[in-house]
Amino acid sequence: MSRIGKKILEIPAGVTITVAEDNTVTVKGPKGELTRTFNADMLIKIEENTLTVERPSEQKEHRALHGTTRALIGNMVEGVTEGFARGLELVGVGYRAQKQGDKLVLSVGYSHPVEMTPEAGLEVEVPAPTKIVIKGIDKQRVGEFAANIRAVRAPEPYKGKGIRYEGEVVRRKEGKTAK
């Protein structure tokens, strides 16, 4: 039995959730609105200020979707109330980030600066030249944009230079040893 799927989701004050006929869930809150369509087999019920997700059978596919559906709706509720943020650090001599208008410009050792434009709904902050913070209400889009930034110059294992997530531990390798 899915423990996450069985958990009842408390709907906080100021958040409204609507479920359409085709299992499209719309969550409105103080920070914005998110909409997502879920598998038609899952039963999403709203009673007063709680939401429950039920599965029709014990088939492997339904068991897998049960917890996933509950977790995704939980993330939608958290996004419209608190929002999500993902931090990145730039490690390396001369590695810098700066914001020019709505673009993020990265100087990470290439012959040219790398320009990235966040999609609508995402906010990029550069509190320091070596720190980047991505904020938004959709957890998946925040994480995806952070991963795209990290992929520009992923941390290398010898010196640890590159763009890493805040708090990420880069596994280091030893260099060659002389004979």
Swiss-Prot record:
SUPFAM superfamilies assigned: Ribosomal protein L6
Report the Pfam families cross-referenced here: Ribosomal_L6
Q: What are the record keywords, sorted?
A: Ribonucleoprotein, Ribosomal protein, RNA-binding, rRNA-binding
Q: What does the record list as GO biological process?
A: cytoplasmic translation
Q: What is this protein called?
A: Large ribosomal subunit protein uL6
Q: What does this protein do?
A: This protein binds to the 23S rRNA, and is important in its secondary structure. It is located near the subunit interface in the base of the L7/L12 stalk, and near the tRNA binding site of the peptidyltransferase center.
Q: What family does this chain come from, according to its entry?
A: Belongs to the universal ribosomal protein uL6 family.
Give GO MF terms, alphabetically: rRNA binding; structural constituent of ribosome
Q: Which domain of life is it from?
A: Bacteria
Report which gene this protein is encoded by: rplF
Gene3D superfamilies recorded: Ribosomal protein L6, alpha-beta domain (3.90.930.12)
- Give the organism the record lists: Bacillus cereus (strain ATCC 14579 / DSM 31 / CCUG 7414 / JCM 2152 / NBRC 15305 / NCIMB 9373 / NCTC 2599 / NRRL B-3711)
> Quick one: a GO cellular component term?
cytosolic large ribosomal subunit
**What interactions and quaternary structure are annotated?**
Part of the 50S ribosomal subunit.
InterPro entries in the cross-refs: Ribosomal_uL6-like (IPR000702), Ribosomal_uL6-like_a/b-dom_sf (IPR036789), Ribosomal_uL6_a/b-dom (IPR020040), Ribosomal_uL6_bac-type (IPR019906), Ribosomal_uL6_CS (IPR002358)
